A protein has these predicted regions:
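Catalytic-loop motifs flanking and including active-site residues across diverse enzymes
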Residues: 41, 212, 239-245
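A conserved active-site cap/scaffold subdomain adjacent to cofactor or substrate pockets
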Residues: 186-192, 205-207
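A short, flexible helix-boundary coil/loop motif
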Residues: 52, 56-62, 69-77, 81-85, ...
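Structural motif
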Residues: 32-38, 231-241
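Active-site-proximal structural scaffolding
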Residues: 113, 123-125, 184, 213, ...
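Short amphipathic alpha-helical "interface-anchor" segments enriched in bulky aromatics
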Residues: 10-14, 103, 200-231
Length: 344
């Protein structure tokens, strides 16, 4: 990242698991199904830079009834707070932290952000309480219309207003909705932030990154196979998650936004473009710069090798030296592609 500041999103994800043999599986709330069910839950931290997401850290939540010898029970709040500390100690430059109401309602988590003087935008419950001195009251400002811009650059009209508890404070409270008349539950958010200044036009987009990352991670789970394991031992599950996150990171690193951060990688990419082989001439090459576009292109790069090993057993039955030679030439050409990998 070359010292560039990033936005950090804290979120938990739960996956349904049948039976009771898998480590740390219990009946608990699973966001993926929107109800309490049998499953495993992890708390995850993601980075966002220039509309590209990348994984930073994952910690499994261990319900009390599933603890093993040597385990210590930690709440999701404690796990998230540990993540913030570890990310700061790793030297990440964090310009903003986003989280849902589980963390927004936690004074422990907010204290951890304050400890590092981090800016935050967090969701809170609609019945969030604030202590007020006698004689002070709660009031709501007028609704302000703004354009909510999404990652695909499309926009929709939203409405925002500040809720003031007594006197003006360094921490401010906001309502964001699609319809100020009906306040639909599924498209109305209650938000708390320590950001200063005129936030009416910017806060909606900043907080919207959180839901966008949630959606993006669901796609990642579907595309990369986050839940496609048959292990019951958590060490094996954790290893699987690490592999998925490594692939996720590799795809993100090959996005134009992150490639451009490092001069040597930029030169390498330019050299790649000036090569006599122009991979982007492939009929199915995607020229957009989003995460799924990069994933599509990396899949095209590995296709010849995968297809070769699918066909190879048949060459024992139907020998074809020309086909074998052609595959060798094609794979050699594909090996000239220079993807970006994380250093260290």
């Amino acid at each position: 990242l070359n010292g560039q500041a990033i936005t950090v999103v804290i979120d938990e994800t739960g996956d349904r698991k049948k039976g009771k043999k898998t480590d740390y599986v219990a009946r608990q709330y699973l966001g993926s199904v929107g109800k309490i069910d049998n499953g495993i839950v992890s708390v995850n931290a993601y980075g966002v830079y220039s509309n590209i997401t990348f994984p930073l850290m994952v910690k499994v939540f261990k319900p009390k009834g599933t603890l093993k010898e040597g385990d210590k029970y930690k709440t999701k709040i404690e796990l998230a707070s540990e993540m913030i500390t570890e990310l700061m100690e790793e030297g990440f430059q964090i310009e903003l932290v986003l989280a849902d109401s589980l963390y927004g309602e936690s004074s422990q988590f907010i204290r951890k952000l304050d400890e590092y003087n981090l800016a935050y935008v967090v969701a809170i419950r609609s019945n969030h309480g604030v202590w007020l001195p006698a004689g002070q009251s709660v009031r709501a400002n007028n609704w302000c219309k703004f354009e909510r811009t999404f990652s695909n650059q499309k926009s929709e009209t939203r409405y925002i207003r500040e809720i003031i508890y007594g006197k003006k404070r360094t921490i401010t409270y906001w309502e964001i909705t699609t319809d100020p008349e009906t306040m639909p539950e599924n498209s109305t958010s209650f938000v708390m932030t320590n950001l200063q200044g005129n936030l009416k036009k910017t806060l909606g987009d900043l907080y919207g990154l959180r839901t966008w990352v949630e959606y993006g991670f669901r796609q990642c789970k579907q595309e990369l196979g986050w839940t496609d394991y048959r292990f019951t031992n958590f060490q094996h599950i954790e290893r699987w998650w690490e592999i998925i996150f490594c692939v996720y990171t590799m795809i993100s690193l090959n996005s134009p936004a992150l490639l451009a951060l490092n001069q040597s990688r930029q030169i390498e990419a330019e050299g790649q473009r000036t090569s006599h082989i122009d991979f982007s001439n492939h009929q199915q090459w995607n020229h957009e710069s989003g995460w799924k576009n990069v994933l599509n292109n990396l899949r095209l790069i590995v296709q010849p090798l995968l297809l070769f090993w699918l066909i190879y057993p048949w060459l024992d039955i139907f020998p074809n030296s020309q086909l074998l030679l052609g595959f060798n030439h094609l794979i050699a050409a594909m090996n000239q592609f220079k993807p970006c990998y994380a250093s260290g």
